[in-house]
Amino acid sequence: MAIYITNTETGKKEELKTIEPGVVKMYVCGPTVYNYIHIGNARPAVVFDAFRRFLEYRGYKVIMVQNFTDIDDKIINEANEWGVDFKDVADTFIAEYWKDAQSLGIRAANFHPRTTDYVNEIVDAVEKLISKGYAYTVENGDVYFSVKKFERYGKLSGKKIEDLISGARVEVNTLKKDPLDFALWKAVKPGEPSWDSPWGCGRPGWHIECSVMSQKLLGDTFDIHAGGEDLIFPHHEDEKSQSEALTGKPFARYWMHNGMIITRGDKMSKSIGNVFLVREAVKRYGKDAVKLFLLSKHYRTPIEFSDEIMMENKKAALKVLKTLNRFEEKYPYPKVPKRDEYMNDIEQKFVEALEDDFNTPKAIALIFDLSKELNKAMDEGKDDEALKRYHLITRVFGSILGLFEGGVKISEGENTNKVIEEILKVRQEFRKAKNFEAADKIRDALLNSNVKILDTPDGTKWEILEVEE
């Protein structure tokens, strides 16, 4: 069967036909590294990591590029606030990104280029755009792309130039020939890092970096460009326009965009101040709950984030993990089951769901069904049937989506009991010191980990809560 994806440029679901048979070349916009990543940042990373896994399962060789924007106004501002070099900020948060990515089981792309490693190539690209008449310099050393010179501007986002001119989003800049024009090169300002160029010292604009890095690593035209829908305009529109002006060729054949994370009615964003960091989410809800949350809705739809919703995902993830744990305790060295019509049929349904515009909600529903069947098979002593379902959940479906593949144990072993008892000793010390706020925080943290405590006249009692089936 063919794979179909929704192409943002056409607004239609299209069959994936790659430039080179059996190979998918894919670029995913990565983070600007000035802070820790939040759940909103994690959605494209998780979604397109899973999509890449699925493509590999279907036999494609995937060449994936995800960039790091390591020079930007936000990075410079952060460096000035800390009193350090901008490279220290970028290096710090690239390292922190990898910690968060690892905590979610996100695999590295084939290439992770950094903007500052491609400045010479960016300067060359800007020079070519100037020579072709698509860009111009201004008196302070800035270089701008002339939007009206590129007739197809607005094709990706569906925006018309006349509407943009009157729109509130257009920045007023008297140096530009037209208010819609965007920066390819920014002239140096006092205290900012800079690089030499024919127009004087400065640094790359945001959009040109992705054009240059993607085309250098994947070619002038590649298969898929992906990212969050908030990047469609202006970032991806500008990127597409300057790339096609530069080469005279189509840029990306397909554009995939994930929906936003919504919290308290707004897009999750550092600028709004409504973010929830990935590391906080993994600590509070667990890796599989976070990934379940990000994959249980179709990738193109927005997702509402709240503690209540996350706790529901945590409960759902724990149901599956508890079932898998039960199987692994009974069969510590599970073998590979013999393929039969049932396994082939279920796997085909799973694959068909993902072939249809990467319908992860439908695919995940099959995992939950298998988990229930696995429990039933163990209850009835049907070992072979249990093994088939365990194999599909962990080694096939879980491997494709990056779910339930970590072998998490949630049993009440001797070590678990000792840890809880030690935590309760610390809590008791806080209670003796009348630091009830700290004691309550420990109580709440234990409850979030499904450990219920009760203070009685005979001391503190505790129990591990059963996860409802």
From Swiss-Prot:
InterPro entries according to UniProt: Cys-tRNA-ligase (IPR015803), Cys-tRNA-synt_Ia_DALR (IPR015273), Cys-tRNA/MSH_ligase (IPR024909), Rossmann-like_a/b/a_fold (IPR014729), tRNA-synt_1_cat_dom (IPR032678), tRNAsynth_Ia_anticodon-bd (IPR009080)
Positions contributing to Zn(2+) binding: C29, C210, H235, E239
GO biological process, one term: cysteinyl-tRNA aminoacylation
Catalytic activity, as annotated: tRNA(Cys) + L-cysteine + ATP = L-cysteinyl-tRNA(Cys) + AMP + diphosphate
EC number(s) recorded for this UniProt protein: 6.1.1.16
Residues spanned by motif 'HIGH' region: 31-41
Keyword set includes Aminoacyl-tRNA synthetase: yes
Cofactor annotation remark: Binds 1 zinc ion per subunit.
Name by which UniProt lists this protein: Cysteine--tRNA ligase
Gene: cysS
